Amino acid sequence: MSRERCRIGVVAPASRMSPDVATSVSALGERLYPDRTPEIVFHPQCFASHGHFAGDDEARAQAFLDVANDGSYNAVWFARGGYGSCRVVESIMSRLMQGSRRKAYVGYSDAGMLLAALYRAGFTAVAHGPVAQDILRDGGDAAVARTLAWMIDRAPEALEPTVDGAKKTAAFNMTVLSHLLGTPLEPDLDGHVLMLEEVGEAMYRIDRSLFHITSNANVRRVSGIMLGRCSNITPNEPDFGMNEEEITQYWCRRAGIPWLGRADIGHDANNKIVPFGPSYGGPTQEALSP
C-alpha cells in the first residue's frame, strides 16, 4: 500500500461530464482515504460543450495531453464514455512525451479507442475500469471506489476475478473493438484473454460485431474470449432466436477461438478492472510517483 498522496487527472476525450460528478467523486475520495486523500483534478475541459462533445477536437486532445504530459500526475482517468475518442486519438498519440508512460490510464467503452492505442504503443499501466461518471449509477460509489483502489494501490480485489497476473488480458466494448480493428489503433492481442461487453444494441448488431471481431486474424490468435454483460439490449424484430451468450459461442466455434465463459465486466456499477497485458497492470503507485 502506498503512503504517498496520489494525484489523478480527469479528462473527457469524448462526451461532456455532469458537473455533479466532480463534487461527489472528490468527497468519496476523502471518505475512503482520510489519511492520504487522493488529489483528483478535473480538467475544466470535462465540463465544456461543443455539440455532441466535451469541447472541440483540439480542446479535448489538448486536455488529455495537459495531464498525460504533466509529471506531477500519477494517473489519467476518463471522465466518461459517450463518443468522440476516435476523433482525437491520433493527435494525442503523436504528441505524448516520454513521461506519459509513467502513468496509469483507466476507462472503458468509448475510451477503448485510446486504451488500445496506448497499449499498442507499449504503455504498461492501461486498464479497462469504471469512469468517474459511474458514480451517478445505482451503486456507483462502489464502482468509483474500485477504480480508486486500483489507481492508488493496485488493489487485487478491484480486479475481474479471473485476472491472476499470469495471463495476458484485454477488455473492450464490442462495438468499439469492432470499429478499431484494422486501424492504426489495433493492439497485438496474441495470447490474450479477450473480454467483451456491450450496451444498448440489438442482437443482430451484437452478431454483426462478433462476426467482424472473430474474423480478424489478430483476434484469432487470442487464447480465448470471455463475455461480459450485454445490457439494455434493444428489441430485435423479429426475435433473433439466440441470446448474447449463444451468439458469442457460435462465432467462437466458427473462428476456432476458445470460449472461456463469462466475465464480470459491463456498463454497470459491478464493472471490474481488467489491466491490459500480462500482469496486474504495470508499476505500483510508488513506482509511478513523480
Task: Please place each PLM-identified region on the residue numbering.
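Short, acidic/small-residue loops that bind anionic groups at enzyme active sites
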Residues: S94-A117, A125-V131, R254, P258-L260
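ATP/nucleoside-binding phosphotransfer catalytic cores, i.e., glycine-rich phosphate-binding loops
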Residues: R229-P290
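Conserved beta-alpha junction segments in alpha/beta enzyme cores
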Residues: V21-S24, K168-V199
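ATP/NTP phosphate-donor binding region
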Residues: M1-S72
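Charged helix-capping and loop-helix junction motifs
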Residues: D56-A61, R208-I213, D239-I247
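Conserved anion/nucleotide-ligand pocket segment
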Residues: F123-G182
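Internal helical hairpin/lid segments
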Residues: D188-E237
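N-terminal glycine-rich "phosphate-gripper" loop used for MgATP/nucleotide binding
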Residues: A75-V88, Y108
